[in-house]
């Protein structure tokens, strides 16, 4: 996830480094939640992938993470383990699912616009690398608008304990009075497995008598975005009510297909 050479290419030669063929989450959260109670942790899970995004910048100055693949449209189980942002396993029905990887990507892409700048002193990533990132202690990343009018921070927590951070905000073009938060975590009690994905969290206000200092508490087994941007449109997995996929259906047999597609479809 980066080394001294990728850092050199960026810092000394001004090259923009991309993380090409970055893995998408490889799990079926409605099943894995039965094993780990969150559906988010484990090797190649969504928190692991979020850690790769953060670590690839902190350790290798990689500024783009390209998911491979973004959409999976192969037959379920016919190729390899699930790996996608959008699950489209039923080409005969048109059914698709905005999977956990989609909401993971939303945490980053909707709260950091093209051209935003990384705050190197407010980025950090660690953990043990072995085709995954495990046993982390801290993983966070901060970006700001070029004119310093907006700011977003991204956190992960794969542990079973709350991670607490004290953040001092200064030299910005806005008065740091309150931050909004968006959190993805596992279900509580008898909730549905995706009940707490991409949900608005509590407002984060300054510590008393320290108007520029904030305490941020990252829940166990979660992905968290803290931002000055508008979050009023966020509504969990119902954030995009106009997106209504076709109903799932079994493949009717015998199945025939002439494989003749228009240029637009291809």
Name what the model sees in each region:
Residues 233-266:
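Extracellular glycan-recognition regions
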Residues 1-27:
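Active-site neighborhood of glycoside hydrolase catalytic domains
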Residues 170-193:
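Solvent-exposed beta-hairpin/edge-strand motifs
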Residues 19-135:
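Aromatic/acidic polysaccharide-binding cleft in carbohydrate-active enzymes
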Residues 121-177, 221:
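Carbohydrate-binding surface patches
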Residues 199-242:
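C-terminal beta-strand-rich structural cap/linker in extracellular carbohydrate-active enzymes
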Residues 2-5, 26-31, 74-77, 162-164, ...:
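Extracytoplasmic/secreted cell-surface and envelope-processing proteins
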Residues 1, 20-24, 67-71, 155-158, ...:
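Active-site-proximal beta-strand/loop segments in catalytic clefts of secreted hydrolases
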């Amino acid at each position: 996830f980066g080394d001294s050479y990728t850092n050199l290419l960026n810092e000394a030669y001004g090259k923009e480094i991309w993380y090409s063929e970055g893995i998408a989450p490889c799990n079926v959260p409605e099943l894995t939640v039965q094993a780990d109670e969150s559906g988010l942790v484990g090797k190649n899970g969504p928190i692991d992938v979020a850690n790769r995004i953060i670590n690839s910048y902190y350790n290798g100055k990689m500024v783009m993470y390209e998911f491979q693949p973004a959409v999976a449209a192969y037959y379920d189980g016919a190729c390899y383990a699930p790996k996608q942002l959008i699950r489209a396993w039923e080409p005969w029905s048109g059914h698709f699912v905005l999977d956990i990887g989609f909401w993971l990507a939303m945490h980053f892409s909707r709260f950091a616009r093209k051209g935003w700048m990384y705050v190197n002193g407010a980025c950090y990533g660690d953990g043990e690398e072995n085709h995954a990132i495990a046993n982390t202690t801290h993983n966070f990343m901060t970006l700001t608008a070029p004119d310093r009018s907006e700011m977003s921070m991204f956190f992960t927590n794969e542990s079973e304990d709350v991670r607490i951070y004290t953040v001092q905000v200064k030299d910005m073009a806005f008065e740091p009075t309150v931050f909004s938060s968006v959190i993805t975590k596992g279900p509580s009690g008898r909730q549905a497995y995706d009940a707490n994905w991409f949900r608005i969290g509590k407002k984060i206000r300054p510590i008393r008598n320290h108007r520029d200092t904030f305490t941020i508490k990252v829940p166990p087994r979660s992905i968290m975005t803290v931002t000055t941007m508008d979050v009023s449109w966020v509504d969990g997995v119902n954030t995009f009510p106009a997106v209504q996929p076709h109903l799932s259906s079994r493949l009717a047999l015998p199945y025939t297909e002439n494989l003749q597609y228009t240029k637009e479809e291809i």
